[in-house]
Regions:
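Single conserved hydrophobic/aromatic residue that forms the stacking wall/gate
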Residues: 1-12
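Polyanion-binding catalytic cores of nucleic-acid enzymes and NTP/SAM-utilizing transferases
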Residues: 10-93
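Generic detector of well-ordered alpha-helical segments enriched in charged/polar residues
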Residues: 25, 48, 80, 156, ...
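Substrate-recognition/cap regions that form aromatic- and gly/pro-loop-enriched pockets
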Residues: 83-178, 185, 189-190
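C-terminal active-site-capping segments
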Residues: 196-232
Length: 232
């Protein structure tokens, strides 16, 4: 939407895709630069979008972009200071990209860890029995412990929260406010599947660049299928 587009690179000019061998690829989505589709976006609007989800925030304690500086630089430094205050680690030599950008690695066949230093999301996908029209998606958080041993916490194993088909991701309190993004991302899956099955040729045509990761995975799967069954 327009609000998020103020601070997120939402089109191909603001995203990068990399492929590493047969079993890993990466997506980097730039944060702190507006969508090229929007014109005349002020730096303060960009920073407000990053931290507050809105392009115009009226609050006495909000972070201000100094005259002549870029929101991306200011936001990255604010993140460094916040992380150091939270866990005691030194982030002064970490890049702006590691502080802000959405960096996602896909490791074949079913593992997707986020990179960078914010609290990291991990995705894992597994078969749902023998159903070809269903799968299990797991979302987990990883977070660094405090650098000071005296301040480190003993973490107990977290029980799995299974969502029913009638629940939304946003119903999971464990996702601490980002579940609605999952719900938005998954809202079009039924239409995507119908479109796939409606192909008259029975084949799929991938976009040259933005869907290169999908093509990469299918090429790897084809290589394994061509080898035939594994021999004991």
């Amino acid at each position: 939407d327009r609000c998020l587009s103020r601070g997120l690179g939402d089109v191909y000019k603001r995203q990068r895709y990399d492929i590493y061998g047969d079993h890993m690829n990466r997506n980097i989505a730039l944060t702190g630069k507006p969508s090229p589709n929007l014109k005349n976006v002020e730096e303060q609007e960009i920073l407000d979008t990053i931290f507050y989800g809105s392009g115009r925030v009226e609050a006495e304690d909000k972070i201000i972009v100094p005259e002549g500086q870029e929101a991306r630089k200011v936001a990255a430094q604010a993140m460094r200071e916040a992380f150091e205050a939270a866990d005691g680690h030194d982030y002064s030599d970490k890049s702006d990209a590691e502080m802000l950008d959405a960096i996602v690695y896909n490791v074949f066949p079913n593992f997707s860890p986020w990179g960078g230093f914010p609290r990291n999301l991990i995705y894992r996908f597994r078969p749902n029995g023998t159903r070809e029209d269903s799968a299990i998606m797991e979302a987990m958080f990883l977070q660094r412990n405090h650098k000071d041993p005296d301040k480190q916490e003993e973490y107990e194993p977290v029980p799995i929260h299974y969502l029913s088909e009638d629940e939304n991701w946003d119903d999971a309190e464990e996702l601490t406010g980002i579940g609605f993004i999952f719900d938005q991302d998954m809202g079009n899956i039924p239409e995507v599947e119908r479109g796939i099955r409606a192909s008259k040729s029975g084949k799929l045509t991938y976009a040259n660049y933005q869907e290169s990761r999908l093509r990469h995975y299918h090429q790897t799967m084809d290589k394994y299928i061509a080898k035939g069954p594994l021999k004991p």
